[in-house]
Amino acid sequence: MADTRELPVFAYIDDIKQLQELRQYLNKHESVKLDPTGPAETAKNLVEICSTLHVLPLWSQDVDLVLNSISSLIVVVPGEKCEPVVDAFIKNVSPKFYKGIGWGSHAGIAVRVLSNLYKGYSNFHTVQEKIFMALVDMCAEARLIGELECNLETLHDRFNTWQTPVEGQREILRAVHRALLVDQRADQAAKVMTALLGTYTEKDAATARDDAMECVRTAVVDPKSFSFDHLERLSAVKALKSSDPLMFTALELFISGTLKDYQQFVAKNPKFVTDYLKVDEVILLKKIRLLTLMSLAEEKNEIKLDELAKQLDIHADETLEEFVIDAIQVNAISGKINEMANTLIVSSYQHRRFGSDQWVLLEKRLKVLIANLKQTHNNVHEVNQRIEAL
């Protein structure tokens, strides 16, 4: 039996009477032909009732009351008999039948009920895992994935608790990724997809083609991502070099290429952006321009605006200034335009690659920082000594 302390109570009548009333209510719909009494065993009785729940949103004004009533009965089913009941419930209370956005929609109602069921099965890991998967899919339909605790740390903790096999982990990560994308959370979706690819090794990397392609696609189109070299180190992505050379070339382009490289690539592969990356080319043009600016900033911290306009294929007017402002706002670079000198002064920038050279540079900067802090500490100590000597 599930932990009923985790669920609200929806009916104050005995189970048999409640089951009969549910059957009587559901039989109001012409397509439902339930026996008025049903099997004596609660589990079998509920399986029959749950098999009709796919039609409930079509006619009932009391979807929430009916689902809550049924869920209060499901949790009293003994543990060894509850799995078929839960299977029937989540099969028929799914995004295929429960639609809408937000808590007030049919999908939102289903999210609330599934959440209660999920909490009630904390001691039954197999059942709880199934409910969680259904909950993620329903959250995607209702655009409520932000309300579900599904960050990577939490997911890994759950996988350990449930002892989820690798393929099961991948299935859940794919579902979370889809839900995040639907809810316009591309940066989080990219992290989830990277974690998914991390489950592959060199032994099975060749089987990860679809996941690897989706990982690259999600990362490239994410407006907040500017560094992609970490993807190159994943076995599943490395395998794209032979299984899908075009996608791998696109990844390399966004790792280190420029606007000119991108334009040449698109000229050779005109349908790649729409067919493979499935994104408006305007978005990618802005992305590659930002990346090109970051590359220029790595080479020098003072860039002539005329040169910048040429490299970015943007008119050297207010349009260029607006682009630079956007670049600063998304933290691609930090700096300011010197209108008198007609230059862009770059004070800092994001690295497109973070390899050994960048680690060496970081080490040098940290050493300088530590030395400065020591000098400041010594100066303060000397001042204190002088004050005490007065």
Swiss-Prot record:
InterPro entries: COPS7/eIF3m, eIF3m, PCI_dom. The keyword ATP-binding does not apply. It comes from the Eukaryota. It is found in: Cytoplasm. One of its GO terms (molecular function) is translation initiation factor activity. Coiled coil: none annotated. One of its GO terms (biological process) is cell cycle switching. GO terms for cellular component: COP9 signalosome; eukaryotic 43S preinitiation complex; eukaryotic 48S preinitiation complex; eukaryotic translation initiation factor 3 complex; eukaryotic translation initiation factor 3 complex, eIF3m. Keywords: Cytoplasm, Developmental protein, Differentiation, Initiation factor, Oogenesis, Protein biosynthesis, Signalosome. Residues 188-351 form the PCI domain. It holds the Pfam family PCI. Component of the eukaryotic translation initiation factor 3 (eIF-3) complex, which is involved in protein synthesis of a specialized repertoire of mRNAs and, together with other initiation factors, stimulates binding of mRNA and methionyl-tRNAi to the 40S ribosome. The eIF-3 complex specifically targets and initiates translation of a subset of mRNAs involved in cell proliferation. Component of the COP9 signalosome complex (CSN), a complex involved in various cellular and developmental processes. Belongs to the eIF-3 subunit M family. Component of the eukaryotic translation initiation factor 3 (eIF-3) complex. Within the eIF-3 complex, interacts directly with eif-3.F. Component of the CSN complex, composed of csn-1, csn-2, csn-3, csn-4, csn-5, csn-6 and csn-7. Within the CSN complex, interacts directly with csn-1 and csn-4. PANTHER family: COP9 SIGNALOSOME COMPLEX SUBUNIT 7/DENDRITIC CELL PROTEIN GA17, EUKARYOTIC TRANSLATION INITIATION FACTOR 3 SUBUNIT M. This is COP9/Signalosome and eIF3 complex-shared subunit 1.
